[in-house]
Design a protein with these regions (language model features):
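A domain-level signal for the structural core that forms small-molecule/cofactor-binding pockets
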Residues: 1-124
Length: 124
């Protein structure tokens, strides 16, 4: 999650929980399968347009980058995007326009959870 510096620990907890809930509910990700990083930026390093495609962005903008193993359908990804937005808005940490999400998919051989193994390439 990329965001402007200044969010409280409680706000970051709400952001993390909202995204995790969407992953669990939409993609059946296990509750304890959590890999989340926050990158906070000073104002001079967090630059974005004020609006695009009908959105009006504020300094509360969250730029969320997600990396998945390839294979999930477009429908599942669209459902996830909607769930993330809905959960963050319901948590009161951001307005609906300020949720910018990018999903990148990688092949199974491009991920190691440790020990120098591509664990997901060993199974299908």
């Amino acid at each position: 999650m990329n965001l402007l510096k200044g969010r409280s620990a409680e706000e970051k907890d709400s952001i993390a929980a909202s995204i995790q809930r969407a992953l669990v509910d939409t993609l059946d990700v296990p509750e304890d399968d959590r890999w989340q990083l926050f990158s906070e930026y000073d104002a001079e390093d967090f630059r974005h347009t004020s609006g695009y495609l009908g959105m009006a962005y504020t300094d509360q903008l969250l730029i969320i980058e997600m990396t998945f193993l390839e294979g999930r359908s477009d429908e599942l990804k669209k459902s996830l995007l909607a769930a993330i937005n809905r959960n963050l808005v319901a948590a009161g940490v951001v307005g609906g326009d300020d949720v910018f999400v990018m999903i990148t998919e990688i092949v199974r051989a491009n991920l190691s959870f440790g020990k120098g193994l591509a664990q997901r390439a060993l199974t299908s």
